């Protein structure tokens, strides 16, 4: 074949290049390349845009997400500050406790597994033997108290059975990763459980058919938490308050000083693994917690105990329906030494009201309108009976009311008409304004008309012409109505306001009521003024009464009451100190001196006036009783108004240091409603114990060498017996510790009636037996006289010191180990 010429070759080449298929292929190649370039550029743009969004625009957010995944941020719980009484005794503290929990889904030793060959599904079944063994061992430790005394646990008790079943049921939940086995467990029990779990898992690391051991493990862990402890239970509960389940102050000082007590939590930031667990990291960042500060109170546990004890006795003896309250306060500084509202609650278990349930139920049903416990129809209207009376709800849940009542601090949350106690304030108004002096006389004819109202004194008695001191002792309503008229509505209101009755006292406690019930100056008409002058028109709180009376006797200064004396850090260093805060001067010193005189005249030596029952031999005491009708409350079943019996005392009367106040809300004593009989003795009893303790100045008479004849107290009510002994300078003790005996009559006493005993001797009174109880005489030889006296007193014995009181006891009149009646006089000879 002849080859084409070179010329023809060029033409052939041109023909080939012009092939359309080749041209299309070339275009595709160019397009593909361009598309690839565009795609790469676009992808790069998207990546760059994404990187821009991630790194720059939203960089902070994504870095935060990364940190959250890579870092573990743990809270370091601050320790809550403690609360102490004035002498450093702990009233509230925080302890470390543990929550014991299990992960049943990871506890392979408690379950057996089987696989379905057809479906491949794995099922787990409980191993009863393993569950029983583990549940038993954990329950024994939980109930042992110390994690060691397992043999002491009664496995037949209901407590054991309940705890065992709870643990068994929790461990049986194979699909659950978290089951609480127990809360608030102490460290000893927690360690014991940990040791048991470790030993169990070690023993089951490998299967041992000969020993019947299956391979597996149990997963039981613990979480640290804190528990608020109140070592004295219901003691001063209304003041201390309590914390909720999360540790936040909910009531009382715990609430008002929450930010001070709580402290500031810290943090630890460290790396964590894929399972969320912390990795050991030397670069971990820790922000230490700042523990809470401590509160040191003006409250004194010894004074508080005395106030609570006698208040409880009075509530029981007089069948008080609506609780009672007591306050002991420094009149010059406002420091509260004791504050009680009874019945109250145990802050260790503040939600529990069972101890007071019967009392609270009766109280709620006595005030159905107040608590709204009537049965309602679906439309919200009340169900009524055939006579149109509202019907009580028989299935109502009153638990919320019960808790609210027992939590309330009655001294600051509830209003009442003060009654005749207010006459002290009216007297102060009159003297300071120049409308009266101690010698101002007014006539009481037994009845007095104001507008359309006619007023009487108690029992409609006519007191005749009397001066200010006599009128206060006689508690003459008509005298003080006339004095109020002399003062006039405008000036009366100004003083009422100045004494602090139109505002809160400012005490450092939460929930002080801001609801005030009084007549404004423009509405204080002649009838309202008349009723207000003797305390029956304006409602106030007990603490308002105490601060006003304090101002009336301390030179005229209204002070802010306080419970916290100082705030300290964890090392005891004082951060803040609370001193006296004088709000204003209300009356002059000269007017205050007059008020002190007429209040002392009210109590005198215990032989005159309604206040005499508060007298304690050896002390100058001023006081005033008040029996008021609660016009704003439902009436009693007999149609009479409910009463409040109260009494306030100050001492020493010439230069008062402390005030003692007691109020009984709606006493149902079968014999009387009078506060001079019901409340005054309670105040006297409190004074009889706290005055010597505080070192209150006496009346100046040296009675150390005197003897007193013991009166015959058999057949007397316990409260009357106390008054008789206080007046003579003898101490007293109810032999039964049960406050319910306080209203009974004395059936036996020792020392016996007629015995000559040293001043200050304790007379033991019995209300349930005709035979005195016996006690063993301690051996006090070789002891100092003071220590011997303390030992004998602790055994319930009285003491007479003979010889050199600065020496040691050489002899004792009753042999050591002898059994004698409580109250027996033991003479110790010292040398």
Feature map (PLM): residue ranges:
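Sec-exported extracytoplasmic/periplasmic mature domains
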Residues: 139-148, 198, 244, 262, ...
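Beta-lactam-recognizing serine transpeptidase/beta-lactamase-like catalytic domain environment
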Residues: 92, 98, 273-287, 332-421, ...
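Ligand-recognition elements built from short beta-strands and adjacent flexible loops
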Residues: 578, 618, 632, 662-831
């Amino acid at each position: 074949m002849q080859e084409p010429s070179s010329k023809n070759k060029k033409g052939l080449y041109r023909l080939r290049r012009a092939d359309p298929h080749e041209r299309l292929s070339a275009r595709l190649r160019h397009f593909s390349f361009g598309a690839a370039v565009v795609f790469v550029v676009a992808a790069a743009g998207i990546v760059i845009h994404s990187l821009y969004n991630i790194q720059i625009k939203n960089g902070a957010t994504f870095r935060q997400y990364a940190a959250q995944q890579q870092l573990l941020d743990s809270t370091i719980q601050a320790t809550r500050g403690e609360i102490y009484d004035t002498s450093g005794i702990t009233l509230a503290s925080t302890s470390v406790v543990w929550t014991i929990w299990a992960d049943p889904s990871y506890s392979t030793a408690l379950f057996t597994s089987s696989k379905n060959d057809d479906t491949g599904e794995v099922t787990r079944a409980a191993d009863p033997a393993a569950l029983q063994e583990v549940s038993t061992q954990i329950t024994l430790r939980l109930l042992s108290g110390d994690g060691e005394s397992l043999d002491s646990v009664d496995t037949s008790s209901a407590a054991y059975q309940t705890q065992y079943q709870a643990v068994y049921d929790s461990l049986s939940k194979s699909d659950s990763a978290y089951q609480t086995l127990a809360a608030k467990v102490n460290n000893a029990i927690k360690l014991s459980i940990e040791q048991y779990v470790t030993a169990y898992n070690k023993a089951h690391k490998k299967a041992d058919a000969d020993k019947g051991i299956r391979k597996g493990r149990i997963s039981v862990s613990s979480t640290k938490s804190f528990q608020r402890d109140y070592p004295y239970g219901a003691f001063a509960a209304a003041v201390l308050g309590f914390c909720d389940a999360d540790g936040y102050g909910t009531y009382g000082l715990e609430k008002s000083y929450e930010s001070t007590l709580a402290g500031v939590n810290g943090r630890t930031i460290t790396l964590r693994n894929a399972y969320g667990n912390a990795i050991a990291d030397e670069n971990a960042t820790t922000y230490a917690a700042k523990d809470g500060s401590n509160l040191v109170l003006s409250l004194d546990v010894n004074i508080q105990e005395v106030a609570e004890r006698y208040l409880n006795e009075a509530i029981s003896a007089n069948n008080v329906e609506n609780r009672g309250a007591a306050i002991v306060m420094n009149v010059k500084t406002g420091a509260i030494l004791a504050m009680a509202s009874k019945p109250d609650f145990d802050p260790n278990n503040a939600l529990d009201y069972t101890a007071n349930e019967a009392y609270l139920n009766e109280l709620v049903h006595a005030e159905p309108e107040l608590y709204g416990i009537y049965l309602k129809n679906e439309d919200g209207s009340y169900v009524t009976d055939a006579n149109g009376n509202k019907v009580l709800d028989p299935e109502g849940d009153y638990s919320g009311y019960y808790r609210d009542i027992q939590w309330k601090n009655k001294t600051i949350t509830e209003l009442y008409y003060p009654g005749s106690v207010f006459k002290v304030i009216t007297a102060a108004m009159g003297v300071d304004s120049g409308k009266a002096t101690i010698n101002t006389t007014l006539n009481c004819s037994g009845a007095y008309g104001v507008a359309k109202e006619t007023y009487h004194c108690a029992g409609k008695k006519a007191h005749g012409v009397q001066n200010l001191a006599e009128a206060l002792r006689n508690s003459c309503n008509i005298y003080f109505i006339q004095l109020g008229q002399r003062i006039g509505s405008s000036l009366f209101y100004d003083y009422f306001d100045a004494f602090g009755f139109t505002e809160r006292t400012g005490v450092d406690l939460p929930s002080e009521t801001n609801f005030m019930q009084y007549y404004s100056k423009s509405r204080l008409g002649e009838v309202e003024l008349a009723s207000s002058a003797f305390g029956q028109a304006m409602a106030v709180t007990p603490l308002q009464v105490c601060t006003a009376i304090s101002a009336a006797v301390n030179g005229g200064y209204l002070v802010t009451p306080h419970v916290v004396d100082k705030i300290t850090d964890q090392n005891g260093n004082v951060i803040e100190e609370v001193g006296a805060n004088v709000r204003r001067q209300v009356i002059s010193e000269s007017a205050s001196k007059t008020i002190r005189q007429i209040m002392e005249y009210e109590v005198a030596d215990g032989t005159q006036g309604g206040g005499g029952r508060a007298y304690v031999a050896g002390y100058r005491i001023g006081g005033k009783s008040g029996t008021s009708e609660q016009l704003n409350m439902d009436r009693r079943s007999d149609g009479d108004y409910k009463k409040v019996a109260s009494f306030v005392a100050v001492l020493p009367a010439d230069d008062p240091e402390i005030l003692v106040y007691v109020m009984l809300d709606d006493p149902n004593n079968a014999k009387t409603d009078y506060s001079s009989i019901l409340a005054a003795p309670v105040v006297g009893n409190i004074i009889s114990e706290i005055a010597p303790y505080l070192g209150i100045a006496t009346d100046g008479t040296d009675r150390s060498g005197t003897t007193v004849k013991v009166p015959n107290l058999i057949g007397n009510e316990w409260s009357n017996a106390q008054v008789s002994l206080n007046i003579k300078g003898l101490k007293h003790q109810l032999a039964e510790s049960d406050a319910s005996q306080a209203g009974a009559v004395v059936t036996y006493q020792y020392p016996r009636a007629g015995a000559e005993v040293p001043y200050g001797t304790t007379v033991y009174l019995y209300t349930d037996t005709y035979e005195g109880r016996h006690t063993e005489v301690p051996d006090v030889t070789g002891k100092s006289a003071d220590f011997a006296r303390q030992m004998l007193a602790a055994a319930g014995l009285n003491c007479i010191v003979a010889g050199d009181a600065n020496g040691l006891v050489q002899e004792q009149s009753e042999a050591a180990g002898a059994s004698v009646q409580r109250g027996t006089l033991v003479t110790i000879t010292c040398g």
